């Protein structure tokens, strides 16, 4: 087995796979992806609700989120040769109170400041877009260019195409440390003792990135968060849009197969004591999510849940990721802390990381996502 590569990517989630694809596409084919699990995309990449959204994001994320929606997602299925089930039908973020609408107006105003078409509409307009919602909904933010896609199919499509273009993957390769050689990040050491060497190392391992980065003196202030989703039995067609709420207590959409896919939040996830290897869902989140869903979509009150799943997300302390070369450790690029909403931006992130490796300017300015922003915390 070859133990060297031009680029080593730690993490075989959607960001790692997308980066491998765009690197190989531009001719950098000596790319090695190390994935700790026995399967690709086993973490949050395949365990989210599939939102491809711009609305509700921090303004620091919007430029590349908008780039992905405008320039990448519409042709991604054709490019990767797989139907990733991308639908651009819009996103309603629902509100039931004046406080909700105030929060939504702030989000919409911030989004418009960087050019996103997002505005707040009243209850009548909401019902015109989605008549199946509760009469308690008095308004919503509306972003017509948001959508959704299939996370697993998208992740595996990037994986398959990158393989075809020459990238290599090793699963079951749990990274213990990065080691510097003459001041530069060069070696990746597995828990088995195996050592791989690369000219550039990209750290995209979700929450575990924090522990790996510490081995070269870098600390990204992240915590972990257990994300849970559920799927209902097939229902008559109701809508194609993406839904969320002002309080972010659930989000989801109806799939092309008729089932609904929802992610939900009990508000108590941080108090749930689970090991990182424990992916079992919790009754508290499922019940809280179902109550929220029924409160907004009464017609789903009798729908049966056929499947649930959970996965860990990496929550950065200020809510946006780190995508940056690290000055203190030449040769190391961080791509972590996506805070539960990295799926929709993955094509743009993969492209930008490939540009960083090639020494090019990125498609948009991401200086606000630099590692340097944490230095004031020390």
At which residue positions do the language-model features occur?
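Beta1/beta-strand and adjacent pyrophosphate-binding region of the FAD-binding site
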Residues: 2-15, 32
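Active-site lid/adjacent beta-loop-alpha segment flanking the redox-cofactor pocket in flavoenzymes
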Residues: 234-331
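Short beta-strand to alpha-helix junction loop
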Residues: 64, 93-103, 142-160, 278-285
């Amino acid at each position: 087995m070859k133990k060297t590569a031009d680029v080593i990517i730690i993490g075989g989630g959607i960001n790692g796979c997308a980066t491998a694809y765009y690197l190989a596409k531009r001719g950098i084919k000596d790319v090695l992806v190390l994935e700790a699990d026995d399967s690709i995309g086993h973490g949050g990449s395949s365990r989210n609700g599939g939102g491809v959204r711009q609305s509700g994001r921090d303004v620091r994320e919007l430029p590349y989120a908008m780039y992905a929606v405008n320039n990448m997602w519409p042709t991604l299925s054709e490019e990767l040769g797989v139907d990733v089930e991308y639908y651009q039908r819009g996103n309603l973020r629902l509100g039931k109170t004046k406080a909700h609408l105030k929060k939504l107006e702030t989000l919409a105003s911030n989004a418009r400041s960087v050019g996103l078409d997002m505005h707040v509409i009243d209850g009548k307009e909401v019902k015109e877009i989605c008549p199946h919602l509760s009469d308690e909904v008095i308004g919503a933010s509306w972003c017509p260019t948001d959508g959704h896609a299939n996370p697993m199919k998208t992740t595996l499509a990037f994986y398959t195409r990158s393989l075809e273009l020459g990238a290599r993957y090793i699963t079951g390769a749990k990274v213990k440390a990065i080691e510097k050689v003459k001041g530069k990040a060069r070696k990746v050491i597995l828990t088995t003792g195996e050592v791989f060497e690369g000219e550039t190392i990209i750290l995209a391992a979700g929450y575990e990135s924090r522990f790996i980065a510490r081995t070269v003196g870098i600390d990204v202030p992240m915590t972990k968060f257990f994300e849970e989703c559920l799927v209902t039995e097939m229902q008559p067609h109701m809508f194609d849009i993406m839904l969320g709420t002002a309080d972010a207590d659930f989000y989801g959409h109806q799939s092309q197969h008729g089932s609904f896919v929802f992610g939900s939040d009990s508000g108590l996830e941080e108090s749930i004591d689970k090991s990182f290897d424990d992916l079992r869902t919790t009754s508290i989140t499922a019940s809280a999510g179902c109550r929220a869903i029924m409160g907004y979509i009464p017609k789903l009150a009798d729908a049966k849940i056929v499947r649930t799943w959970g996965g860990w997300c990496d929550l950065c302390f200020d809510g946006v990721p780190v995508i940056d070369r690290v000055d203190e450790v030449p040769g190391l690029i961080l791509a972590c802390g996506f805070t539960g909403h990295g799926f929709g931006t993955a094509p743009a992130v993969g492209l930008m990381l490939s540009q960083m490796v090639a020494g090019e300017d990125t498609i948009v300015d991401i200086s606000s996502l630099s590692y340097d922003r944490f230095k004031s915390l020390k």
